[in-house]
Amino acid sequence: MSSEKAEVDVLFECFYMSLGVREGHPMLTLRWPLTPMPPPAIGQTYNGVTFNLGSTNTILIRDDGKNILVDPGIIQLGRYGCLPKRLAEFGLKPADIDIVINTHCHYDHTESNYMWRGKPLFIHEAEYDYAAELYWPEWRNAFIDILDVQKFSGEKKITKNVRLIETFGHTQGSISALVETTEGLVACIGDAAIVKEDYLELRMPSVVTKNISGATAVDSLKKIAGYKPVLVIPGHDTAFKP
């Protein structure tokens, strides 16, 4: 028998590293989760490029008899068995996941989607179009289209206590999941706020894609705050109480 309210757990807390070269030697530095985000401790890099390896917060929601996964994360979490082992701690197998949500389509949120081929994937219709322009031509097919894509716009209720809302800014189709729990509303907001200071100080996101203004991104943060969440889970920082 399912409980009246949903349960929310962070399966993996975000991590982020930068790889580069300083004085001819490789450098690997941990950057997140730290707020505010420090600059990389890397001077000279490959043609001025720093290579990043990291993943987002991956969230498990259990509601109304359904197991929902928000932002499965980078491909290594699936490839090296991290996701199956973490799910097992909750008595679940990958096959027990009923629904996948992508708050947006950047690689660090979506690459392990492949583990749920054919399962329902909720994504904003504008984000689905945006995904076709990312990375390389076949990318959307490899990580998005192999699931049963459920495109939507506006607001979408997917289970008794889980609804999706538009929170554009970081990308043109960014969404957030609002979850009613016994403690109150939990907001899983993806990169609408990269770190908690973005939310608390109404800061513009680090990435604002075409056709979206910084003002739109800030309006999305105000929109989320208007729901009065008791817990906010940003994309790349630890969960916090506003």
Please place each PLM-identified region on the residue numbering.
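Short hydrophobic/aromatic-enriched beta-strand-loop microsegments
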Residues: 120-125, 187-190
